[in-house]
């Protein structure tokens, strides 16, 4: 039996692949926002810690874990690595495809703290953060001392999380599917944008190109490295991480 952790485009692809096999599998997401159609799959919702995952795997005879979660879901990645080691269950990491890092036009940041330091050093006063609602608290030193806007998903759970982190709702803007990335940038006139290295399926290239065309500075947080205990696939090739074939990141 196979257990997939998803909630992403990659999760959908994994579902489609396993549905074609015609055998039962489990699909787990943290929340209930992703709408997926399952015939052979069984939906699970809610976060699980290592003990809960190990127990579930033992009870349901899980022999393979597929990590198709967001590249920045570091807690889940670490939990699955722990489960894999302790239960001897292999993990396939369904990785996104990432463009080569542009060192000329993008200021790359190791993590959130590094991003805060570099943005403050450059004296950026108006910032548009496209890093998601869960990063508001991590970036608090920026919005406490400058004008920061966050674009988030237009749903109640996101607004609730923003309020819980103490962020002003007047500086929240909502993602509109299919909307040109330049629309919000032209409306807010930020000096810089802050992104996650979210890959092609995360719209990274479109955001970068929109900012470049408008002369807006770009800061990007590097994706976390994938565990070398995972077997990594990206839909185009199979490799064991780290790999020399991905020279710009050996998330």
Question: Model-flagged regions — what are they?
Answer:
Residues 49-101, 199:
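N-terminal glycine-rich phosphate/adenylate-binding segment common to multiple enzyme folds
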Residues 63-64, 126, 191-192:
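Structural motif
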Residues 41-56, 172-180:
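Glycine-rich, highly charged phosphate/nucleotide-binding loops
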Residues 27-47, 161-163:
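N-terminal beta-loop-helix "entrance" segment that forms/cooperates
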Residues 1-21, 26-28, 89-93, 97-171, ...:
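Non-catalytic interface/targeting segments
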Residues 163, 167-169, 175-184, 188, ...:
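A C-terminal functional module that forms or caps the active site or interfaces directly
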Residues 86-105, 214-229:
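Short, acidic/small-residue loops that bind anionic groups at enzyme active sites
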Residues 239-244:
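Conserved small/polar residues in nucleotide/adenosyl-binding loops
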């Amino acid at each position: 039996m196979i257990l997939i952790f998803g909630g992403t485009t990659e999760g959908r692809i994994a579902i489609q692949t396993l549905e074609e096999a015609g055998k039962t599998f489990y699909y787990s997401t943290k929340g209930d926002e992703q709408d997926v159609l399952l015939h052979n799959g069984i939906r699970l919702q809610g976060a699980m810690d290592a003990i809960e995952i190990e127990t579930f795997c033992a009870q349901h005879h899980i022999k393979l874990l597929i990590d198709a979660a967001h590249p920045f879901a570091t807690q889940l990645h670490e939990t699955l690595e722990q489960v894999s080691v302790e239960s001897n269950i292999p993990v396939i990491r369904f990785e996104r495809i990432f463009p080569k890092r542009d060192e000329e036009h993008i200021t790359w940041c190791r993590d959130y703290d590094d991003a805060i330091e570099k943005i403050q050093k450059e004296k950026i006063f108006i910032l548009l953060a496209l890093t998601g609602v869960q990063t508001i608290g991590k970036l608090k030193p920026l919005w406490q001392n400058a004008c920061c806007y966050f674009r988030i998903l237009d749903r109640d759970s996101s607004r609730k999380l923003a309020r819980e982190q103490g962020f002003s709702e007047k500086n929240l803007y909502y993602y509109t599917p299919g909307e040109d990335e330049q629309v919000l940038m032209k409306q807010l006139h930020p000096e810089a944008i802050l992104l996650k290295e979210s890959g092609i399926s995360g719209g990274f290239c479109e955001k970068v190109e929109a900012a470049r065309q408008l002369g807006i500075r770009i800061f990007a947080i590097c994706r976390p490295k994938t565990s070398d205990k995972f077997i990594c696939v990206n839909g185009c090739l199979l490799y064991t991480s780290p790999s020399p074939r991905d020279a710009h990141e050996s998330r």
